[in-house]
Structures are given as C-alpha cells and as structure tokens.
Amino acid sequence: MNRTDPPITPELVASHGLKPDEYERILKLIGRVPTFTELGIFSAMWNEHCSYKSSRIHLRGLPTKAPWVIQGPGENAGVIDIGDGQAVVFKMESHNHPSYIEPYQGATTGVGGILRDVFTMGARPIACLNALSFGDPSHPKTRHLVGGVVAGVGGYGNSFGVPTVGGQVRFHTRYDGNILVNAMAVGLADADKIFYAAASGVNMPIVYLGSKTGRDGIHGATMASAEFDDDSAEKRPTVQVGDPFAEKLLLEACLEIMETDCVIAIQDMGAAGLTCSAVEMGAKGDLGVDLDLDSVPTREQGMSAYEMMLSESQERMLMVLKPEKEKEAEAIFRKWGLDFAIVGYTTPSQRFVVKHGGDVMVDLPIKELESEAPLYDRPHVPSPQLPVVHARDVAPRLPVADALEKLIATPELCSKRWVWEQYDHVIGGNTVQRPGGDAAVVRVEDGPKGLALTVDVTPRYCEADPFEGGKQAVAEAWRNITAVGGRPLAITDNLNFGNPERPEIMGQFVGCLKGIAAACTALDFPVVSGNVSLYNETNGRGILPTPSIGGVGLLDDFTQSASLAFKAEGECILLIGETQGWLGQSVYLRDVCGREEGAPPPVDLAAEKRNGDVVRGMIHAGTVTAVHDISDGGLLVALAEMAMAGGIGAALDAAPEAIVPHAWWFGEDQARYIVTVHEKDLLSVFTKLKAVEVPCVQIGLTGGHEIAIAGERAVHVKALQHGFESWLPDYMAGRVETSGIPDR
C-alpha cells in the first residue's frame, strides 16, 4: 500500500459504487484488504457499465448467429460478411450521463469512443448515426443541452472526417433529468483481416498508443452506473475531453500498422481506460499482464497509480505486439506524431500486476477480475396491461386537415433538419441518401453495393407494453431498411433504462429484451453488438424505456435504392398492409387529443416479414417509384412527408366507412408501407400482392400542390413544409413559446 493512500473504509467502498456484499466478495477472492488502486480497479471492472451484472443473464436470450455473422457480441464491435471479401463492422453505444453534465464534451467523446470501437477491429469508419433524447422543450435546460450535444456530435464527426448520415431526435419530459446520447458507427474491413482483443503468447510487449494520459474521465464508468441527483453538476471532472484530430491520426496509424505483420491483439481504451483494456486483453487470452506505470505517457505531473489506471483520457489504444516488430511499429506511430510506449508484457501467471515507482500497486487474479463480477437475477415484475383505446371512443378534437397541420409542426414529428445540417453528411463522397428518409444509404467503395443504415425505437410503446415495444423497435428498423431496398442483415442495440434495482424497471428491461429477441428471430435479423445503459434516473425519476436499435442492411446495387419523395404527377398511391385505425399511444392521441394512454399497436411479425419482402421485391423489380414506411403520426403524416420531399401534392380518397376518419389517417398500425406506381403497372401489382395475400388498396393519385382529401379542407404542400421545417430552428432561436408538448 502506498503511504499516501487513504484507508479502506466502508464509506470509501460505498463511494466507489460497491455494495457491502460485493466488497465481501472481493475480500474472499483476494484474501486480504485491497489497496486503494485495487479498490478503484474493482469498482471500474465490477460496475454496471463494464460488467453488465444486472443484464447479462437476460442478454443471453438474444439471437446472435447467422451464416453472415463473423463476430457477434463480446468484442469491440460486431462484424458481418457482405460478400466479395468485405465485412461491415458496427456498434452503438451510449454516452448519456457525461452528455447531461457537459453536453459538448460528452457528445464528442461518445462519438470518438464508438469510432475507436470500429477501427480497433481493422475497419475504416464510413458512417455515423445517433439517437438523441431530450427533455420537454419547456424545461430550462433543454435548449442548452440540445445545442451542446448537436454541436459536439457534429464537431467531432466533421473534424474526424466521417459522415453523420441519420438518426433520431425526440423530446419528452421523462428525459428532463437524463438525456440520452446514443452513437453508432459503421466501418468497412476486409473479411479476413479482422483484429481482436485477445492477447496470445508469453512475454509479448504491451504497447500504449495515441494521446497522453491525463486526469479527465476518472470514474467515468462508475458515474455511468449510478443515478443522478441534485449534485450531478459536481461530476463534471469525470467527463472526458475529446480531440478528433488526434483520433484521425490514431485511425491512420492503426490502419497502417494493421497492414503489417506486427499486431497480435488490439483494444481501445474506453470505459475504465487502461484498466479495462489491459484486463480484457489478458483474460480473453488466458494470460497474465504486468504493467509498469512509469512508462505511461502522461500530460500532467505527479499522477498516481490510481489516477493512471482509471483515467478515461481519449484517443488511446493498447496493443500486444510481436517483439521483433517493435522498431517498425514505433516508426509508424512516431510518423503520425503519436505516443508509443512499451508499458508491460504478457505473462503466464494469470495475474494482473501493476507497478509504479518500483512498488507493486496491484496484484490481482485477472480472470476473476474480468469474469467474476456479481451476476444478478434481479426481481422483476411485468408492466400492467393497458386497455385498448377504441377509435370510436376518441372524439376528434380537430378536422383532419387541421390535425395534420398541428402534428407536422410538433417537436415529435417536425423536421430535424436543424440538427442534421450541422453534421457533414456527405464527406467521403459516398452518401447516396441523406438524412430525412427512412434509412440512409451509403455506397460501398469499389463496387455497386450500398449499405442501408437506420436507428429506431418508439419509447412510448415500450413504456406502455415493453414486449410489443421491443418488437416494434426491431420491426421499424427492418421496415426502414426495406423501404430503401435494403436486405436487413443485423442489428446493434443500445438498451437505455432506469434503475434495475426497482422491479418495475427491471420488468421493462426484461419485457423489451424478450420483444427484441422475438422480432430478431422472426425477421432473421441477429444482434451482433450492443450496449446496456442503466440507472438513467434523476432523484428517483426514470427515463422512458428506450432500447435503441441500429440496423444495417445491404443493397446489391445502390443505384436501385428507393426514396420516399413523390416523383411525378399522376402516379397511383397504394397502401400496403392492414389498417385497423390503432390510436393507442399514437402521436395523434397525445398531441391532438391530450391523451397519452392505451395499449400500443400490436406487431404481427409474420405480416412484417411478408409485407416487407414483397415491397423489397417491388423495389428491385423497378415497379415502384416511391416508398415510405408508416410509423409515428400514421398514414397522413407519412403521405405529407412524401409530398413535401417531392414538392408534389396528392388527391386522396375519403376514409373507408368501416374506420372513423381520424383513426384511418392517424392510427399507427404496424407493417405498413405507402408506395407509388405508374398506372400501367397497377393491375399487375394488385395481382402479385393478392397472390401472396398482402393487403393493398389504392388511396389516391399524386399531383397538384395540395394534399386534398375528399370531403376535407385541402392543405397546400408549401404551408405544411413551413410548419414542418420551422419549429426546431424557431425553438432553438427562442422564437417559440414552450409550455411542454402542445395540449399534452
């Protein structure tokens, strides 16, 4: 023990996020009182963020295998085969707590961390996406948080040189004290040149690469495993500071060294920094690790072993190197102006030993440190089943046209252009479809292939019925990829929930996970990577359950992708899928009728698969001219989005007599698409869809400058566009009154 270390007291243990029984487990495991640095290491490795101790037993139920899956969960990122010797590497991860405390730096380092996860595997990043959840617009912090987070996401991605091509932005009062910043990165690699974290070989040099270590981010992972309270602002020093230009240099240096025969294993320093990366590399390779902290490059004087082991300074890597390749490897990193230091060696001892100033500061069993964290099967109770809201029991507050104008200009449904125009979404020159559509499409260089990318979840559904909400999040990602012509291949998940020690919250988690598993199985859409973020609560008030789903699909020919914009006048508008007029948990019911209630729409996975496969086939056959899936806001909002994107109106038939008009136009039934076709193809389309028992009905024709529903007031497309595009920039400029989401 270092003479300057504090004594290990119950209060010190508790301040490290360890429960009394967890500390007793440590005492039994190592047979003595831990040193201060060892306590910090256990705190980092055994917290929720790193160990998944509350979620791991439930994550085992997710489907993770398919013939095209090269690497599933357990590595830095998932890897899927897209043919021709190419692989896609991708993952999504949260940076929620830091982004609430320090929105700009929290968001930048969230982007930087997920980019490192991808290029650590040997992939060059080609795209980023994000899912951002903010509090009610009227909350005094919301505008500041939106501005900081969006600037941070854009600032890092733009400077690093990767396009940010899509995502989600939502507002809800349940995120007032805990915003969510979920970042997804996608990269391309050679399928036979994937790099992994497991070390191999005894007495192999362990090399520190990248930027110097400072005191920023200490206990960042532990902070991410606890609730917030009124003193959360005091945790600002635990937020890391990002440097996208250093990360760009690190990327190029790593990819260059990966072209040599130098690398045995590589791991980025993310949560828990040097501790987690060193322990994982050794434990995965059944090896011990000896580190000498005197060799670690630091940017601050007098850093202790505790600080160096727990720092989460950014833009750093740890690599196990072939010993005869040291000079070659060092020359590469020096060329890029980066630190290169041999800080340790692999050993056969199965021990994690850390020295500083000639003293042994840490001597722990490495496998137990990595894999013996407590595993909890926490009590959980199912969410109460909510009654179905029958459409005929909902009195329409507004005429259909007025309701459309109101909805299209709400925080939930308005254009998020103000956000994505701050991102460089075309850098690299491979972005085929930009933000604002169903899914982004990015060209795969050196060939005709494209990737369809999306991020989706509907938290209000997950709150009302976790199982159906989990299913719907996956199904919508699958639909969005399908709507641009992609073949859905795999997902990454980012599971954001409240305090798992509350049975009702754990019940939400379990229910959503079961729904995700059911949908992934039915749609052949495996989970290959992900992240769990728990304790998203402030003063006991939790967020909406938000299991963000990042989906990746493949287009054999990116030039055959579909988009949502109406293309020409006089085309037939078809509604594919069954419409019952489901209003429970709809945006219409909440924002027009002031009722946030009812069961969400059920998800028929067989119908999702059948309808989606048919739509994708029509896209590939060149039968359809525009495609859009129907989600938030229902049929009429989707039609308005198509009209605004194309600058062309539509003449629409009245709602069928069997369904009340507001339910027909604004219900959020699932497994539905709108497509447009040439009149000459109409009969053949109906014939094909009837043969495979896919519901389809013509609902109108494109043309003119208005959305004109029979028997309703017509709405000019430009007027809709104004409301659609105005709300968010007006809000950020302080030009709109906010008293919460309208009529809530």
Curated annotation (Swiss-Prot):
Q: What pathway is this protein said to act in by its record?
A: Purine metabolism; IMP biosynthesis via de novo pathway; 5-amino-1-(5-phospho-D-ribosyl)imidazole from N(2)-formyl-N(1)-(5-phospho-D-ribosyl)glycinamide: step 1/2
According to its UniProt entry, the function of this protein is described as:
Part of the phosphoribosylformylglycinamidine synthase complex involved in the purines biosynthetic pathway. Catalyzes the ATP-dependent conversion of formylglycinamide ribonucleotide (FGAR) and glutamine to yield formylglycinamidine ribonucleotide (FGAM) and glutamate. The FGAM synthase complex is composed of three subunits. PurQ produces an ammonia molecule by converting glutamine to glutamate. PurL transfers the ammonia molecule to FGAR to form FGAM in an ATP-dependent manner.
Q: Which gene encodes it?
A: purL
Q: Its Gene Ontology molecular function terms?
A: ATP binding; magnesium ion binding; phosphoribosylformylglycinamidine synthase activity
Q: Which proteins does it associate with, and in what oligomeric form?
A: Monomer. Part of the FGAM synthase complex composed of 1 PurL, 1 PurQ and 2 PurS subunits.
Sequence positions that bind ATP = 52, 91, 493, 530
Which family does the record assign? Belongs to the FGAMS family.
Q: Where in the cell is it found?
A: Cytoplasm
EC numbers, comma separated: 6.3.5.3
Which reactions is this enzyme annotated as catalysing?
Answer: N(2)-formyl-N(1)-(5-phospho-beta-D-ribosyl)glycinamide + L-glutamine + ATP + H2O = 2-formamido-N(1)-(5-O-phospho-beta-D-ribosyl)acetamidine + L-glutamate + ADP + phosphate + H(+)
- The protein's organism comes out as Nitrobacter hamburgensis (strain DSM 10229 / NCIMB 13809 / X14)
The superkingdom of the source organism is Bacteria
Q: What does the record give as the active site?
A: 49, 95 (proton acceptor)
For Mg(2+) 2, which residues are the binding ones? 117, 268
Ligand binding (substrate)? 94-97, 116, 240, 312-314, 533
Output the Gene Ontology cellular-component terms: cytoplasm
Report the principal subcellular site.
Answer: cytoplasm
- What's this protein's name? Phosphoribosylformylglycinamidine synthase subunit PurL
Identify which top EC class this enzyme belongs to. ligase
Keywords annotated in UniProt: ATP-binding, Cytoplasm, Ligase, Magnesium, Metal-binding, Nucleotide-binding, Purine biosynthesis
Single Gene Ontology BP annotation: 'de novo' IMP biosynthetic process
Q: Cite the PANTHER family for this sequence.
A: PHOSPHORIBOSYLFORMYLGLYCINAMIDINE SYNTHASE SUBUNIT PURL
Which annotated residues bind Mg(2+) 1?
93, 531
Q: Could you tell me which InterPro entries the record lists for this protein?
A: PRibForGlyAmidine_synth_PurL (IPR010074), PurL_linker (IPR041609), PurM-like_C_dom (IPR010918), PurM-like_C_sf (IPR036676), PurM-like_N (IPR016188), PurM-like_N_sf (IPR036921)
